Amino acid sequence: MILLQTSLIWVVYAVVVVVLFAVASVFIYVYQSPRDRSPSVTLTCIVAITSLLATILLLPVDVALVSSTVSSSVGQRKDWATPEVVDRITFSLTLVYYILYSLDILLCLLVVPFVYFWYEEYDEVAAQTGEQSSGQRFWGASKYTLSFIAILIILFLVGVFVPISRANGGNGLDPFKSLLGENRGERALTFALGLLITIGMYVYALHTSTGLAVLPIRLIKGGPRLSNAGSWNATFTVQLDSNRERRRQLEGRCGGNFDHLSSKDRRELDALIREERTLIRRQRLAQEADGKGNALLPRMWFRLEAFFRPFRRLVGLILLLLVLLIWVSMILTASDKAKNSICKRHCGYVLGHINIFNPINEIFVQSAKLFPIDYAIFTMLVLLLFFGTVVGIATVGIRFLWISIFRIRLGHTSPQALLVMTAILMLSILALNYSISMIVAPQYATFGPQTFCDRLSGSSVLPELQCVVKRCSEAFGSDAAKKVCTPSVASTVLNRVTVSFPFFGAIFFWSQFAFIGVYLLALITSLLRSPKLDEQQLDEDAEEAEEEALLSGSRRNMDDRWQSIVGRASRSEDT
């Protein structure tokens, strides 16, 4: 029975990983630029995102497996749940976690940078003429990746030798002292994981919070578009008439011979010609938005958009309420940690017992009794936070200080930007792993629905009723709790980071308040600001579409000419 139960749980996880691979594939395909697709970049981004999402979505499997050893209704371990069986379950989970975390670190610090430089080293002309071989390209990418290999080695060496916290028992650290006894390999991985989560907290506090505020409001209000297409069309018509009138004046001044124009007038004429092309493109877009264009597909798209607009607003409203519920839950747990943490900054604000009701946490604890309902809810939560981060990155952009380096847009993201965005998403997902497990749903992520039977000393009631069923918690140090309760491996790994290196735990904790503040500021800004149409970007997109159409037309013409030449040659041979 136990083998069948655990096998089904792992089968559900395998199905979820396949779904994640499909989601990552569609996500990368939708965002990458069709003109600059690279198979190596696409595959790397898909594998990296799938690996990170698979790591965080292992948590419900972790909770389900450790919770399956306990009968929550009576607070006792099941007959088959011997210490050896429980140790075997936790060992297998620990092994999977360490493999996934190691893979995540290697992908983020080694594979993604190498593929980035591999793409940058490609010279199309040199490759076509045979002047650049794959070996030369590999060596060029490897030289630049050596710095990341050095960072990775230094990171693990520092993790091996850096001293861990040795807080005394007076700090209330007794329930967590077992976490300090890991070997040096675990210590190195713990330090590397803590450092990457720390970097990811910046992305989480800035981009994820901004995206979660912008995404629902954008669905409710609608994105920037040609909302009043009729007036836009009239405006563009007037501007186009004015442009052409000025061109006629200049052409009349020179009598059709442009050599007679001054350099100033020639520059003005060139500017008017460029402006005319821009206005014609804008006028065509406005006509399509107004349903007056000749193209069938754009007209159908705008009509479908108008039909689904009420449903989109309903989805936006539901997402807004859900994100606000998550935000309130984070405030409650963060306040609980700040007030009731057993050892405050000495152990990274670890919370031994939940003292303030958390609605999201309670939803997960109750749904965990009916696996995989909690898994479905957890997956939707993770995907919401993931796509919120994507929207935040697209809104803020990839910047260094105030300088914009890359822009993330649907169908217009370059391979370099795609790789950088993937690395940023990997860091943010690591930070999300901590926030969901320790802030959003701490009881669920640590013990799930596990309970234990707390014996009542000196009770006069029947022996089978001489106990009170309580939820498991680290704060309970009784023998009954220790014999029954098994913390999840995910919570053990994260608590090991915060207890062994309290400065990481302090950064993680205070980053939650930064997230809360940035979200509130971004939400107020999104509510007050109306979406604006980026005319410059609209012109660039239209120009790019025209170039693509011209290139496609040129390719078709060349193919037709080639087929015609081949046909004439074959007919000549027959003759």
From Swiss-Prot:
Q: Which InterPro entries match?
A: LMBD1_LysCbl_Transport, LMBR1-like_membr_prot
GO cellular component annotations, sorted alphabetically?
vacuolar membrane
Protein name per UniProt: Probable lysosomal cobalamin transporter
Q: Where is this region: Disordered?
A: 537-556
Residue stretches spanning the membrane: 8-28, 46-66, 95-115, 144-164, 188-208, 314-334, 376-396, 420-440, 504-524
**Per the UniProt entry, what are the Gene Ontology biological process annotations, in alphabetical order?**
protein localization to vacuole
Q: Which family does it belong to?
A: Belongs to the LIMR family. LMBRD1 subfamily.
Main localization of the protein described in the UniProt heading: membrane
Q: What does this protein do?
A: Probable lysosomal cobalamin transporter. Required to export cobalamin from lysosomes allowing its conversion to cofactors.
Membrane topology (UniProt): Multi-pass membrane protein
- One Pfam entry for this protein is LMBR1
Stretches with biased composition (Acidic residues):
537-549
User: In which domain of life is the source organism classified?
Assistant: Eukaryota
- Keywords for this protein: Cobalamin, Cobalt, Glycoprotein, Lysosome, Membrane, Transmembrane, Transmembrane helix, Transport
Recorded coiled-coil stretches: none
